[in-house]
């Protein structure tokens, strides 16, 4: 009887170890897996392109990340250039993307989250106020004023933002992001501009404001 119980315990431990082993993305079993963006195969990511058809262009993009972007394209005064697997298919399975962010004077990259990635953020020009908020129940704000050359980390999945403090000069930053397809959820857009819209009754109760204010925000 004792040996049978020991066997059951051993089987349970092996099962737990196996579950933990498959919980993370496996290590690469080949040099690369260039995304076949036209493949009909649906997997968690993209199917691999036939390696005999891979060229150097699959790992390259003339992104001109050294060139300033137009920050008047939206009302918040920022322009984001994301280079991910959709831009460079060779990034598939490699777990990294790069971003350039341009800020107008007093420009904002509004509160948002990357559900699949951590971000390491570097200021190239200007002075930015940045921060992130922890999960419930604390909702603690960690914030910092960054100058040229400073680096800040935004943990995976947490809401974060950047704001150009200078009313006269633009700012520039770049980020490395720990996913080839990090995703982005802009909080205001997700809540007030979902498709179809979230009921104004729900939002009015959630934010404890009059429905007229919600209707205005959703307009």
Curated annotation (Swiss-Prot):
More about this protein: Member of the 12 germin-like protein gene cluster located on chromosome 8 in the major-effect quantitative trait loci (QTL) for fungal blast resistance. Partial suppression of the 12 germin-like protein genes increases susceptibility to the fungal pathogens causing rice blast and sheath blight diseases.
What does the UniProt keyword field contain? Apoplast, Disulfide bond, Glycoprotein, Manganese, Metal-binding, Secreted, Signal
Annotated S-S bridges: 33-48
Q: What is its main location?
A: secreted
Binding partners and assembly: Oligomer (believed to be a pentamer but probably hexamer).
- Which Pfam family, giving just one, matches this sequence? Cupin_1
- Protein name in the entry: Putative germin-like protein 8-1
Q: Which residues are glycosylated?
A: 53, 79
A cellular component term from Gene Ontology for this protein is:
apoplast
Offer an example of a GO molecular function term for this protein.
manganese ion binding
Compartments it resides in: Secreted, Extracellular space, Apoplast
Which residues does the annotation say bind Mn(2+)?
A: 112, 114, 119, 160
Traced from the root, the source organism's taxonomic lineage reads: Eukaryota, Viridiplantae, Streptophyta, Embryophyta, Tracheophyta
Similarity comment text for this entry? Belongs to the germin family.
The entry's function note states: Plays a role in broad-spectrum disease resistance. Probably has no oxalate oxidase activity even if the active site is conserved.
Instruction: Give the Cupin type-1 domain ranges.
Output: 63-215
The residues forming the signal peptide are 1-23
